[in-house]
């Protein structure tokens, strides 16, 4: 059986945290900021954690990621 490979596109978009979670960037941050409030823009600057349901789904894709 072939080796499980890390999904490289996903590996470039997330970082594993010390506690084993996955940190990701946020969507809606590339353009069209005039339609967003100052509060939204400020909150979009922060990184976010991958949700529990998504983590279960993508765990296989990151099998060999450190």
Swiss-Prot record:
Belongs to the bacterial ribosomal protein bL35 family. Residues 1-16, 23-45 have a biased composition (Basic residues). GO terms for cellular component: cytosolic large ribosomal subunit. Residues 1-53 are annotated as: Disordered. Gene3D superfamilies: 4.10.410.60. It comes from Enterococcus faecalis (strain ATCC 700802 / V583). Pfam families: Ribosomal_L35p (PF01632). This is Large ribosomal subunit protein bL35. InterPro entries: Ribosomal_bL35 (IPR001706), Ribosomal_bL35-like (IPR021137), Ribosomal_bL35_CS (IPR018265), Ribosomal_bL35_sf (IPR037229). It comes from the Bacteria. The gene is rpmI. Keywords: Ribonucleoprotein, Ribosomal protein. GO terms for biological process: translation. GO terms for molecular function: structural constituent of ribosome.
